[in-house]
């Protein structure tokens, strides 16, 4: 099942982007499977069914996709030398069966690939999945800020080629390079991050 889902709209001419995070437990109609949690779509039919589900739910065509898994995410982060960000509270969670041990102290932190993965995965606090979505957006903003540093800015097209090697996508190689160039020119004030609004509820005893 997909843990993080976002719908992005990129305007190459206006040099702007909008990123809408979709909480994984959002109840939607999955074609052929009825009303279920959004993240079930990927489990049932992979990226094609997830794309169809999101497109139907929001009434927009999904032209392209980017898919990153747990194994490749840390390697992508390490390509840019990790990310610096502020952690407002300690993130601590242990799942021995799942071989997961998250322990990120409060305060300003430098996150390498593995710690960055733990940061975006953590959801064991009062905000649950919404808190995780907020941290994922915080991380993405910090990563974009890192790419704006002079030593990385000129290398964005080159880095884009490296990163694409770890991503499953239907973008062509030339489109990936074009996207890298777009990120290079993108002003942080031209990126709008938002989270799909909703309210928590229980259906047949399941949240």
Regions found by a protein language model. Give the residues of each.
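Non-catalytic, solvent-exposed segments at the cell envelope interface
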Residues: 1-207
